Amino acid sequence: MKAIRTAELDIEDIATIHNRIRTQKLSPVEVLAGCLKRIEQVNPQLNAFITVLADQALAQATAAEAEIKTGKWRGPLHGIPVAIKDFYDTAGIKTTAAFERFKDRVPHKDAVGVAKLKEAGAVIIGKTNMHRLGEGTTGLDSYFGPVHNPWSPQHIAGGFIIRISSSSCDRHVLCHFGH
């Protein structure tokens, strides 16, 4: 699977990637491969992802690519890898809220926002780590271990920035769903 270069992920914003996908200058599979490569490289240090859905995401990216080639365009998120905060239900995929008692919880249906992302053609790449049950601001209290700050490892990632800095800003993904 050909991957977008990590350098391109570092400098190109979501609008640029979207336009390149829409005009078929870049494929959703290439973008996904670049994101998965980045996750593999840096997630062991950052612990931003609880679950990575490589196989499912590849199937979604391949389907998005086929749709785009036939002229079906769902909108600006079509083919874009999106991470989901582990607080939001994803059908058939563990949703734990980073809480030990929910470690094996698998919902039967998607949260409304997740369903809307899928309808828009977004590629769900994985579930991101968070403070247990969303009850704190540090990101240190997760059943899956603390989330680390990509810019300054000696500092906490902190609250909302947990997901934003550790997945989107370090360019694991181009977009993140969660508050």
Per-range role (PLM):
Residues 54-77, 103, 107, 117, ...:
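Flexible, acidic active-site loops/lids enriched in D/E/S/T/G that coordinate Mg2+ and/or position polar
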Residues 109-179:
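Short glycine/serine-rich loop segments
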Residues 26-27, 73, 173:
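Conserved hydrophobic residue
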Residues 1-56:
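An N-terminal boundary/leader segment
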Residues 17-21, 61-64, 164:
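Generic hydrophobic alpha-helical segments
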